[in-house]
From Swiss-Prot:
Keyword list, A-Z: Acetylation, Actin-binding, Cell cycle, Cell division, Cell membrane, Cytoplasm, Cytoskeleton, Membrane, Mitosis, Phosphoprotein, Transport
Residues covered by region (Spectrin--actin-binding): 652-837
Residues making up the signal peptide according to the UniProt record: none
Transport in keyword set: yes
Record's compositionally biased regions (Low complexity): 555-567, 718-729
Residues bearing PTM Phosphothreonine: T745
Annotated stretches, region: Disordered: 1-190, 514-594, 639-788, 804-839
Protein name per the record: Band 4.1-like protein 2
Residue ranges annotated for the FERM domain, each copy included: 211-492
Main location: cytoplasm
Amino acid sequence: MTTEVGSASEVKKGSDQAGADASKEKAKEVENEQTPVSEPEEEKGSQPGPPVERQSTPRLRKRGKDPSENRGISRFIPPWLKKQRSYNLVVAKDGGDKKEPTQADVEDQILGKEESLPEEESRAKGDAEEMAQRKHLEVQVEVREAKPALKSSVETQPAEEVRKDKEETIQDTQEEKLEGGAAKRETKEVQTSELKAEVASQKATKKTKTVLAKVTLLDGTEYSCDLEKRAKGQVLFDRVCEHLNLLEKDYFGLLFQDHPEQKNWLDPAKEIKRQLKNLPWLFTFNVKFYPPDPSQLTEDITRYFLCLQLRQDIASGRLPCSFVTHALLGSYTLQAEHGDYDPEEYDSIDLGDFQFAPAHTKELEEKVSELHKTHRGLSPAQADSQFLENAKRLSMYGVDLHHAKDSEGVDIKLGVCANGLLIYKDRLRINRFAWPKILKISYKRSNFYIKVRPAELEQFESTIGFKLPNHRAAKRLWKVCVEHHTFYRLVSPEQPPKTKFLTLGSKFRYSGRTQAQTREASTLIDRPAPQFERASSKRVSRSLDGAPIGVVDQSPPGEGSVPGPGVISYTTIQDGRRDSKSPTKATPLPAEGKKNTLRVDGDNIYVRHSNLMLEDLDKAQEAILKHQASISELKRNFMASTPEPRPSEWEKRRVTPLPFQPQASSHETLNVVEEKKRAEVGKDESVITEEMNGKEMSPGHGPGETRKVEPVAHKDSTSLSSESSSSSSESEEDVGEYQPHHRVTEGTIREEQEECDEELEEEPGQGAKVVEREAAVPDAVPDRQAGASVLPVETEAQEHVVAQKLPGEKGAHGGTAEQDPREEAEEDPHRVNGEVPHLDLDGLPEIICCSEPPVVKTEMVTISDASQRTEISTKEVPIVQTETKTITYESPQIDGGAGGDSGVLLTAQTITSESASTTTTTHITKTVKGGISETRIEKRIVITGDAALDHDQALAQAIREAREQHPDMSVTRVVVHKETELAEEGEE
């Protein structure tokens, strides 16, 4: 490369130097050609100074070339500009040999300074500094060459002028390029910032992109609003509640349908677009959690929306009820929407606009109109309260049904409610799992599993599985169970499990407020009662349409009411601490001799069914009701009906809340006086609405279902125990599990007590060492059965008959009859706390259950007719003359511990069976004394009749029957007790 540059310089100077310089240039060419070869020798010191200068020159070029060529604008400089460096070096060589070392030193110093600069600083300075340094170097070399080389400078002056002009031109060009490059950089930076701003604004517009959401409200109107596409469900729900002026909003939710025939609840914690894939966004506003006691709601507007939801449930068939119930609820609907009955305006009301029942008939409209006349004076809020008080006692109130199949492929329905999980088959409730009884809920693919707590005598937990249509249905059911358990049972929501690495299964947990938190927040509501228009009638909710003298004051719910002229009267049924009012004119019951039962094959049990669920199938009963043309006829049939069994006092005490206790006295006083007056007329006063039989406890129970018989659970557990609920290898979409933490609230203790009652119904083991048996012997007891295997049958049988007891007998409800003290002392040590009021579970008459304060002193009224005898027992026993006779038999083999130390109580069970003239109560206790298990059976038989009995014969028959029924046990004690009052005799 050096040779080419040197020869090119000589060609340019050929016109000025002709002869003498030619030989010198040739010698220089030879030396330049030999320079690469002589470089190793120069390093060893064999060459003089000038070759060292030539050696440093290529290194300088190499050092100067590499950085400049690798960065900046130097890559775009044409080659003829880069050759100027070699041209200057050639001129320096011609100037003289003495200055060459100095030139090399200067170049090395300048290059050393350049290389010592930081790389970042040299890059920032760019190519402009590099060109300035080169120019400075060339100027210094030329100045130093001027004195010793005058001749050569004169000869080369034109060439230098040309070179200077070219260098200035090159410098100007480079400066212009550098300035242009800087301007371009600034322009690019500005453009980039503008583009970024535009992109950011575009992104902002994309983020604020709105989607139209439409919500169908409970009154049929539609609410629309624009939402951000990334908005969460809570935003939409809050807007809807704000539009409705609703504060108690935790009972409600939004439903959407993303798949045919399947609706899902909108999760407020997730984005809507992640839950609802399709546009437009369509939702329906519904009640999600049905309040077990609507009277505890604070605002009327909340009760109004609950009424609207229940009307939809009734019209769609989700909430089945009888013809009479349809008519009663429809009459309250008319009263709330249109006010008092007005014959002039009634013709203008189109009852076809109201869907009172799935099958809307003309006869139903007539019955609704007749009942509407009796509600004069009720405000809309009061009518809604009465509507809810009757609707909450329906067996399917608040039950969310899901289609499923059991292990044998039989179609069933799983119902989720406030108290637990219900199993329905052919519209019959065949099983119930309370929340305290469930340990874990899980799903895997399309299978749904519940792990049930083992019974007292069981060692292993049982898992019951159900097959759902698909995995979405299984996940939806699982979510509903998680939400219901958290809302009704927990004090505060459970936090989602912490996310771990590579964990499977759903992390879903209920994120809203629980019922306890909602009630606490409701007490803090401090605003005037909101006024709202009812959609169907445009009637203002808080207006009263006149209040005649006989107005029934029913608001707030729970306060007493005084029956006035033309106003429906109420009969109060004391429920421990709360009184339940039922209209006597409104809900007639058909006469029924016995409760219908369903026998389950393979198990010695009866499964009670809900009468309300089967009323639509009972055509004969419906036909009878349809022939009743007037209110008086309805009342007569209602009075003649057989009362249905009532829950035990223990069940009632567990259910009823405390705030209603102070109001019981006034209700009882008013209604007992009314009962006395009616009893004087001679009517059988056993008044109760159809919805009230056993439903005072809580929603989800069938009417009258105060005792739970659940051997079906053991059957399912056996058949499904091999199925696994493991979720270790499934994705989040197909697997989820939930283990309830039973942090109960104040109002949920009743399920725990129900579970204890269920466990006490376990069959006792046989082969005990000592048996003590108390029995009174009737002439014939057809429904007394032997052994523990028939205990569930005896349990069910007691619900079929109305108890007919003398006032003097000692009943399970704390009766006041005189009793042998020895017998009392013998029975009391074996009774579990809470079991005494549980003995005669449904045996008392339906009117007054009198074991709880306040005490109202009344006289006892006995009503007798030719076909039926029913006595009403009160707390005060009339003073009568009685004759008592007691015969006691004690075995000489009595065990010493039988009457003394009772040992450790394991289980206690009480079974009551009744027939027309006989009541049999069996009390079974299992204790452990000194490591020995002892089963003790005490049977008490009460016979009501006029015939005289031979006590000796009764005693012998009792001993004989006891030994025949239990040959492996010994009879230790038999007591025959006879009480004679006037002309009637009672034996115990």
